C-alpha cells in the first residue's frame, strides 16, 4: 500500500432483505437447468484468446482474480505467489488502465511481472474459461457489487445465470465482502453443487483491495468465504 491515509467514510450496507433470499435456491436450479445461450461479446472473446495462449503455455499454478478493479489485489497476489501466473479480470477499461504501483516498488526489489490485467465481461469470460478447461488453483472474488436490494438478487454472482460456471472455476474459491449475508447466500448456492465452505472474519494487516482498506478504516468488519473442492 502507499503512504496515503485511508479515511473511514464508507457507509454500511443498506438492504431491505434481512435474511437469505427466499427464491435463491429456485433461481440457482433454474440456471442449472437452462444454461445461458447469450452470444459471447467480441471484445471478451478477443481478450480471452490472447490470455488463453499464455495460460495454456504455462506449467505452474494459475490464480484468477475476478472483479479486480484497479488491479491492486492482482499485484499483491502475484507478489505473494511469485511462481504463479495471476490473472486479474475487470469489465472497466478505466479501472484496468489506472497505473497503481503499490506493489511494484514498495520493497525496492523491482517490478512484479507475473500477472496480467484483462478487460473482459466476466459473464462471458467464465464460460470461456470452463470450455477451455483452465486449471485454476485459487479463484478470488473480492468485494463484488453486493446489489443489496432483494429485487436485484439475480444481479449477485450467486443469483446470476453464470453461477454454474463460476462455481466450476478453481480448486479453491475465495470471496470477501463487508456484507456477511452475501457470503452466506453464496455458500448456500455452492451447497447445491455439493461444495462446502467456511466464513471467517478478516483481520489482515495489509488490505487486499482499496475497498477493503476503506471498509476497515470505517470500522466495518470484513468477511471471507473459502470454498474447497
Feature map (PLM): residue ranges:
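S-adenosyl-L-methionine
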Residues: 2-62, 72-80, 103-132
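Conserved beta-strand/loop positions that form the S-adenosyl-L-methionine
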Residues: 66, 89
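Class I SAM-dependent methyltransferase "Motif I" SAM/SAH-binding loop
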Residues: 67-71
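Conserved SAM/SAH-binding beta-strand->alpha-helix loop
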Residues: 92
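Conserved SAM-binding loop
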Residues: 99
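Conserved beta-strand signature within the Rossmann-like core of class I S-adenosyl-L-methionine
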Residues: 170-177
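Class I S-adenosyl-L-methionine
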Residues: 182-189, 193-229
Amino acid at each position: 500500500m502507499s503512504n496515503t491515509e485511508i479515511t473511514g467514510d464508507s457507509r454500511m450496507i443498506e438492504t431491505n432483505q434481512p435474511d437469505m433470499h427466499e427464491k435463491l435456491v429456485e433461481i440457482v436450479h433454474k440456471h442449472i437447468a437452462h444454461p445461458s445461450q447469450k452470444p459471447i461479446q467480441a471484445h471478451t472473446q478477443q481478450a480471452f484468446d490472447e490470455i488463453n495462449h499464455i495460460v495454456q503455455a504455462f506449467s505452474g499454478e494459475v490464480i484468477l482474480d475476478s472483479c479486480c478493479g484497479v488491479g491492486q489485489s492482482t499485484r499483491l497476489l502475484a507478489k505473494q505467489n511469485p511462481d504463479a501466473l495471476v490473472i486479474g479480470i475487470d469489465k472497466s477499461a478505466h479501472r484496468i488502465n489506472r497505473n497503481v504501483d503499490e506493489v511494484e516498488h514498495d520493497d525496492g526489489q523491482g517490478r512484479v511481472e507475473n500477472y496480467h490485467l484483462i478487460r473482459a465481461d466476466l459473464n462471458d469470460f467464465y464460460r470461456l474459461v470452463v470450455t477451455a478447461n483452465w486449471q485454476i488453483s485459487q479463484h478470488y472474488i473480492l468485494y463484488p457489487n453486493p446489489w443489496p436490494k432483494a429485487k436485484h438478487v439475480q444481479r449477485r454472482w450467486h443469483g446470476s445465470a453464470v453461477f454454474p460456471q463460476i462455481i466450476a472455476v478453481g480448486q479453491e474459491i475465495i470471496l470477501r465482502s463487508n456484507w456477511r449475508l452475501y457470503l452466506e447466500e453464496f455458500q448456500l448456492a455452492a451447497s447445491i453443487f455439493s461444495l462446502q465452505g467456511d466464513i471467517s472474519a478478516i483481520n489482515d494487516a495489509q488490505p487486499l483491495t482499496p475497498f477493503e482498506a476503506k471498509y476497515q478504516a470505517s470500522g466495518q468488519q470484513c468477511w471471507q468465504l473459502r470454498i474447497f473442492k
